[in-house]
Amino acid sequence: RKICVIDGRVGFIGGMNIAKRYVKGTGKQKWRDTHLRIEGGGVYALQRAFLIDWYFVDRTLVSNRKYYPPVDSKIRNNCLVQVVTSSPIAPWPDIMQGYVRILLQAQKYVYMETPYFLPTEPVLFAMRTAALAGVDIRLLMPRHSDARMVEWASRSYLMEAIEAGVKVYLYTGGFNHSKLLVSDDNL
């Protein structure tokens, strides 16, 4: 996870790693990524995810109240934030289940962006089902990956998606490391 929480009030999350190549790219290709700034109650959820990971690694429980300032409960710009996390050791695959639900409940469109298209069977099934039902399903992925084996593996899933009506777009401006999903103007 790439999480940064500052004074319990501002959080950043996304795909950005900390190294020069993620800012300037490599000699071979530019690097594109997406990172979000979050304020308000959503920051607590980011901090919680970070502290759970911290405890898992260090066995240190960070509970001092100074790390948890009062939350500004105002909803700005009519925007709500929900942070969903998953891990290989979690009892439920929350992110995967969220993707499946979003895909199967979409009425108009779902636009997805991923650097590595390695869908689980339920996600691929939901993408195909939604596309066959007339939902505009679009997938943006990099034309070339930063890992050749992953690129080949990703390509192996594309025909099945395309045959169901998923529109696949290849990003050619370098390596796109973003992981995004938007659906029906409300998610």
Predicted regions and their residues:
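Charged, low-complexity intrinsically disordered terminal segments
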Residues: R1-L187
